[in-house]
Swiss-Prot record:
<dbReference type="GO" id="GO:0032259">
    <property type="term" value="P:methylation"/>
</dbReference>
<dbReference type="GO" id="GO:0016279">
    <property type="term" value="F:protein-lysine N-methyltransferase activity"/>
</dbReference>
<feature type="binding site">
    <location>
        <position position="173"/>
    </location>
    <ligand>
        <name>S-adenosyl-L-methionine</name>
    </ligand>
</feature>
<comment type="similarity">
    <text>Belongs to the methyltransferase superfamily. PrmA family.</text>
</comment>
<keyword id="KW-0949">S-adenosyl-L-methionine</keyword>
<dbReference type="InterPro" id="IPR050078">
    <property type="entry name" value="Ribosomal_L11_MeTrfase_PrmA"/>
</dbReference>
<comment type="function">
    <text>Methylates ribosomal protein L11.</text>
</comment>
<protein>
    <recommendedName>
        <fullName>Ribosomal protein L11 methyltransferase</fullName>
        <ecNumber>2.1.1.-</ecNumber>
    </recommendedName>
</protein>
<feature type="binding site">
    <location>
        <position position="195"/>
    </location>
    <ligand>
        <name>S-adenosyl-L-methionine</name>
    </ligand>
</feature>
<feature type="binding site">
    <location>
        <position position="234"/>
    </location>
    <ligand>
        <name>S-adenosyl-L-methionine</name>
    </ligand>
</feature>
<dbReference type="Pfam" id="PF06325">
    <property type="entry name" value="PrmA"/>
</dbReference>
<keyword id="KW-0963">Cytoplasm</keyword>
<keyword id="KW-0808">Transferase</keyword>
<keyword id="KW-0489">Methyltransferase</keyword>
<feature type="binding site">
    <location>
        <position position="152"/>
    </location>
    <ligand>
        <name>S-adenosyl-L-methionine</name>
    </ligand>
</feature>
<dbReference type="GO" id="GO:0005829">
    <property type="term" value="C:cytosol"/>
</dbReference>
<dbReference type="InterPro" id="IPR004498">
    <property type="entry name" value="Ribosomal_PrmA_MeTrfase"/>
</dbReference>
Amino acid sequence: MSYRELVVELAREHAEALSDALLDLGALSVSVEDADADTPDEQPLFGEPGLVPDRTAWQHSRVVALLSADHEPAVLLAAATNEIGLAETPQFVVREVEEQDWVRLTQSQFEPIPIGERIWVVPSWHDAPDPDALVLELDPGLAFGTGSHPTTRLCMEWLEQSVKPGQSVLDYGCGSGILAILAKKCGANPVIGIDIDPQAVESARQNSERNRAEVTYGLPDACPDGEFDIVVANILSNPLKLMASMLASKVKPGGRIALSGVLARQADEVAAVYARYVDISVWREHEGWVCLAGTRRESH
C-alpha cells in the first residue's frame, strides 16, 4: 500500500484543532512540529507532570498528516478546515511516501550503545560488539529508557561506579527497567523497580526476563516498606521535588541516592529540596542534563 503526507503550516491556535479534524476525517496519523525547527526562530517546548504547560504548540506550527492513497489530500484538508471554522484553506504540500520494509528501517536506526567503561545496550537484532562487556539486551519500545537519552546514560554511569555486590537497590520510575537490570547485573540484590504506568511495569518485566535479571516490579502501592542501600530515580524535576520526602525516606542512613531527569538550570532548585534529607550535589552533567547524587545523613 502507498501513502501520502499532507503538510500544512499554520498558526499555533489552529494546529491542535486541525490535527483532531484530520484524524476524524480518516488520517492515519497526525503530528505537530515546529515549522521553524533548526532555524534561529526555533521554540523549545517543555512539559512536566504536575505542571500546566503555557502552550501546547509552536507559534509557527507544521501539521503533518499521513494518508492512505485513497484519500485526496486537498479534499480532506478542505473538509477539515471547514469543520474547525477557518475562513479559507491554508496552503499545503503533498509528499509521496515510498513503500519500505518498516521493520528493517526502524531496526537500522538503533545501533548498540556503549555507556561508561564496560556497558553496552544492544538491540536483540545485533550481536554484542564486545563479548566481555556488561551487556543489556533492550529493544526500543513504549516504555522510556534505552540508554540513548542523556539522563539514562548518566544514571547508568553512576550505577556502574556505585553499586556493590549484595546492595539493595530501588529504581523509582523504572520505565523499561534498564537501570534496575543494570543494578542487578552489577551484583545488587534485591532490586525493586516501581513505575506509575502499568504498561511500563509489564515492559520492564519482559526486559528483565530477556536479560535473565531477577528484579521485582510493581506499581507505587506495591513498593515495599523499608530502606535501600541505593535509590535511583530518573523522572523529571517537578515529580522529584514532590516526592522528595518519600524518596529520601527509602534510603538507608549512610545510603546513596541518584536523581536525574533534571535540566542543568533546574539542578539548584531540586538539590535545595533534597538538602534537608541528604548531602547532595551535581555528580555529572551531559548535554544540558544533570545527575544529582548524595548520601543520606545518619539522622534527619
